[in-house]
Amino acid sequence: MFQKLHHVAYRCRDAQETVEFYTKVVGLKYAAGEQSPEGARPYGEEVDLIHIFFECGHGSYIAFFDLPSSPPMQADPNTPSWVNHIAF
């Protein structure tokens, strides 16, 4: 059995909006962020991405990927909106 969760990651629409919300509204500490260089293949395929992390305590983080060059994400029409959530 594992001892702790290092991080979970989700996609976000806008990295800057996400930083503002999680630091100013939720009160989490911004831990790290990186933007892939043009032409980078960090996950085996060329992708434009911004990856940001927030501290949740006890060595755990919540992370987000902003994929600015990808089509906008869509909600799954077969999943009720209350299913997808984060609880602190």
Residue locations for each model-derived region?
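Generic detector of leucine side chains in alpha-helical contexts
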Residues: L5, L28, L49, L67, ...
